[in-house]
Amino acid sequence: MTLQQEIIRALGAKPHINAEEEIRRSVDFLKAYLKTYPFLKSLVLGISGGQDSTLTGKLCQTAITELREETGNDALQFIAVRLPFGVQADEQDCQDAIAFIQPDRVLTVNIKGAVLASEQALREAGIELSDFVRGNEKARERMKAQYSIAGMTNGVVVGTDHAAEAVTGFFTKYGDGGTDINPLFRLNKRQGKQLLAALGCPEHLYKKAPTADLEDDRPSLPDEAALGVTYDNIDDYLEGKTLDASIAKIIEGWYIRTEHKRRTPITVFDDFWKRS
């Protein structure tokens, strides 16, 4: 088995999908989880206005709405959480995403004060954060807020991770990568667009350039610039297509270097790290 085949298998990626079937699969997956643990009353998700959180949010709200109708349990809710650092650059996109999703409840938690307070506490301890590390601090603060909300609403935190993100490890460890349940896992980036199109999402929300927008020195840095490959490259790779060797090498390099992000904490029984 080639490394490409190993990766495709590990991430459950498929070369072709039926958008309607995958929408139903994700919605039913979320519903089944909540029905299995009836003490759970909410799905909690951070909404940025980008493709992944918009899609995940719509799936969450659909699942909750259907489950309420099926069970008569009005306590079930989907909570969309806005988590700006100060003023969000693409504020209108976030508003448009909220309008499309129509969440049961929208909360806004501005993380700037908490991030700056943490940075100052570290500075006083003699640790000066780089801009890159501060970016990860933002991602972790966002997740911290979501878990606090989930804890107070008997909920689970929903993630937006998908195959095109997982293969490169393009998420913050214990930040946006630290979630309870990931309904998009298996899909690549272009497949996510197919689902949003099928759901009637405004095109500008999934045709915009994806960005984590965590760095102050490089605001709205496109994911593709940070990764050194395009999402089309990554999607082609995950669909089993043959890529230029230099492109495949970059993708596989990201996969190997970030394997620890896709695992629970490393123990003496693990040996995957020996190949990195």
UniProtKB/Swiss-Prot annotation:
Functional summary from the UniProt entry: Catalyzes the ATP-dependent amidation of deamido-NAD to form NAD. Uses ammonia as a nitrogen source.
Gene Ontology molecular functions: ATP binding; glutaminase activity; metal ion binding; NAD+ synthase (glutamine-hydrolyzing) activity; NAD+ synthase activity
Entry keyword annotation includes NAD: yes
Protein name in the entry: NH(3)-dependent NAD(+) synthetase
Biological or metabolic pathway of the protein: Cofactor biosynthesis; NAD(+) biosynthesis; NAD(+) from deamido-NAD(+) (ammonia route): step 1/1
Gene encoding the protein: nadE
NCBIfam families: nadE (TIGR00552), PRK00768.1 (NF001979)
Reaction(s) the record says it catalyses: deamido-NAD(+) + NH4(+) + ATP = AMP + diphosphate + NAD(+) + H(+)
Superkingdom: Bacteria
Complex and partners: Homodimer.
UniProt: Mg(2+) binding residues: 52, 165
GO CC aspect terms: cytoplasm
Residues annotated for ATP binding in this entry: 46-53, 160, 189, 211
Binding site for deamido-NAD(+): 140, 173, 180, 260-261
